A protein has these predicted regions:
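N-terminal carbohydrate-binding/catalytic regions of secreted carbohydrate-active enzymes
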Residues: 45-119
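Extracytoplasmic
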Residues: 299-435
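Aromatic- and acid-rich polysaccharide-binding/catalytic face
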Residues: 94, 123, 173-211, 215-229, ...
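Bacterial N-terminal signal peptides
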Residues: 8-15
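Bacterial Sec-dependent N-terminal signal peptides
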Residues: 16-42
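Active-site clefts of carbohydrate-active enzymes
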Residues: 158, 164-167, 214-241, 259-278
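Aromatic-rich peripheral "rim/lid" segments of glycoside hydrolase catalytic domains that contact
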Residues: 91-93, 253, 260-313
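Active-site groove signature of glycoside hydrolases
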Residues: 113-135, 156-167, 188-197, 221, ...
Length: 435
């Protein structure tokens, strides 16, 4: 697996200073965008994580290249997982699930792993089968947790809230409001608000997340998947994942999120179809797991070096978060890109995809890899300006890919390239700049 490659500092500074700034003497389509970092491949998301125990060490290399954090509802991870996290750019978040946590175990873990950053508080206190606490009961247990976080220099995350079953406190906002109003408790105690959500409607998830803006804190969505109502098949879960991850990555309010759950005891063909890992030995990613790993981090601080083929899923911005993606079946594009990725299966009129690309030399042409059952026309915008239209005649297939080409002279440097489908619909696999 190729990992994200950042240019050496000196080279990066040269590229940024000479290629990613406006140059008044260059042609009209020269880069006029802010400074940034040129990379070979998209970095992994700083937000993406899982709620999982990682008891099988073979699961670690499957997910760790694509996630930055994990928690398992406990005070510590397994020893194998802790070692792997330390050497693979991940952090583990200890949790005080209820009042029966071990402060000494947390202290020992942080001492052995000084890069630990966060401490999670009570798990779903307004559910009777979870932490099961009224705001007053939780407040009585709160000061030692605040003190522990300060002692260990950890940022404290609020109790994880969901719609609950505790009498009088089904509404998570009501529980939190009363909790933060308790003697000895302050909103300033916490760095972020933790929430859980199992609504199957992506728009409902968005509304739920934004409901917690009132606290003026970052939001951590620490458990989620489509479960209520139960999805009818795995394709529904896949569509949900696309919409929700695109939202979570693009929403500034959201600082972190964790999928529930990479593997359960149920078979893969059982609802709610949310498993990322197979039950085989050795395990592999499920198609849903591939999507979770390969969906774009939408990182606008980096510019992809277009010396390779750019996969359609490597966008940094899109107009509609309901864009549907699936593991790519375009072997030619995948081989040319040198990285696993996804294809867009519902690129429809009105949709927009934005890419941040760097080219070291003057380009001559843009190629799009696509297929579909209708004739399509795509607008090409470069650095904020409409440049041309790309004809994409139907090829009558969902598995065979064809190429549409158009002249495109880009000066060396960083450029935003936006594809906006004007009419028709198609699947999109990749784009390529040629010299």
């Amino acid at each position: 697996m190729k990992r994200t490659t950042i240019f050496a500092l000196l080279i990066a500074m040269v590229f940024i200073n000479t290629s990613c700034r406006e140059n008044k003497e260059e042609p009209i389509n020269n880069s006029v965008i802010p400074q940034g970092t040129v990379v070979d491949y998209m970095p992994k998301s700083s937000k993406r994580g899982v709620s999982f125990s990682f008891t099988n060490v073979m699961d670690l290399p499957l997910l760790s290249p694509y996630i930055t954090w994990d928690y398992n509802w406990g005070n510590t991870p397994t020893n194998d997982a802790a070692l792997w996290f330390d050497t693979n750019g991940m952090d583990f978040c200890p949790m005080c699930w209820n009042g029966n946590y071990s402060a000494d175990r947390i202290r020992s873990f942080v001492a052995a792993h000084p890069n630990t950053k966060y401490l999670l508080a009570f798990n779903e206190p307004n559910l009777t089968d979870q932490a099961n606490m009224t705001p007053a009961q939780a407040a009585a247990l709160w000061p030692p947790i605040v003190a522990l976080a300060k002692e260990l220099n950890l940022k404290l995350i609020s109790p994880a809230m969901n719609y609950g079953t505790l009498a009088g406190y089904s509404n998570p906002i009501k529980w939190l409001d009363e909790f933060f109003a308790q003697p000895g408790v302050s909103i300033d105690d916490v760095h972020a608000i933790s929430i859980h959500c199992y609504m199957s409607s992506p728009s409902a998830v968005q509304d739920y997340v934004r409901m917690f803006r009132k606290y003026n804190k970052p939001v951590w969505l620490t458990e989620f998947c489509a479960w209520d109502p139960v999805p009818g098949n795995v394709e529904v879960q896949k569509d949900y994942m696309c919409s929700v991850l695109n939202f979570l990555e693009s929403e500034a309010l959201v600082e972190r999120y964790a999928w529930f759950i990479p593997r359960s005891s149920a078979s893969l063909d059982k609802a709610p179809y949310m498993q990322l890992l197979t039950h085989t030995n050795p395990p592999t990613l499920t198609p849903l797991g591939e999507m979770f790993c390969y969906l774009s981090p939408m990182d606008t601080t980096v510019w992809l070096d277009a010396k390779r083929t750019i996969l359609a899923s490597e966008y940094v911005k899109l107009k509609n978060t309901s864009m549907a993606l699936r593991p790519s079946n375009d072997s030619v594009a995948l081989a040319s890109a040198g990285v696993p990725g996804l294809m867009i299966t519902n690129f429809a009129a009105g949709q927009q995809l934005t890419y941040q690309l760097y080219t070291a030399t003057q380009t001559k042409q843009l190629n799009l890899r696509y297929n579909g059952y209708s004739n399509s026309i795509c607008e090409l915008h470069v650095d904020g300006k409409l440049q041309n239209y790309i004809d994409m005649p139907r090829n009558g297939s969902s598995t065979e890919w064809v190429t549409a080409s158009i002249p495109l002279e880009l000066t060396p440097g960083c450029h935003t390239v936006m594809l906006a489908l004007f009419s028709g619909s198609c699947s999109l696999s990749a784009l390529e700049l040629t010299k």
